[in-house]
Amino acid sequence: NEMLQACALLSARDSESAAAMQAASGQDARWLPDLSLSAPAEGREQARKGVIVGDSVKLSARKVLAMTAARFTDARFVPTKTLQSKIWNSAIMRGLLYRIYNGVFPLHTPPFLMPATEEAYLKEIAATRLHITGRFHAVCLSMLVETPFLALSSNASKIERLLTDAGLGKSRMADPARLKQASPEAPFSGDELTAIRAFRQMASERAE
């Protein structure tokens, strides 16, 4: 509490954290969505195909996501990592990394792509019809380019708080049981798109 009281400015990226900081410090605390949501982006109107399955901080969640990827015939594994070394051009090395990183050892693995840059990663998200992930920033980028997503719980409930502030509630959260039955398509409703666009607009205005 003393550390918070000593700060000249208190800011958080979700309303729940801002309220907790304000209660603990007795000072005003502002909040604005993650800055990635205020970035310019292209590709929202392009044709989409396939399913991207991402990763998570938690090994247990990565195992669930890897098993989910195996369910879909057109799924690709695209983690948040950007790896530029030429060694990862080797299918053998990618297959080994996939198995070790996710803690699963299937005979065959889904296509495994590691974009070299954040821009390339965003383009992959913008071109898919569904993104399944356990990463907070992957969800942010999905909203940025209006790609439908399903999200596993994150550490410290970051994703849940993000979606609450965005007006999406828990409809886009998925536990392992739901992912076992998930369809390869989960388009946004009109209300969801309206909420996401309003949230991005608010993020842009507060970031200025």
Predicted features by range, described:
Residues 1-208:
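Active-site anion-handling motifs in enzyme catalytic cores
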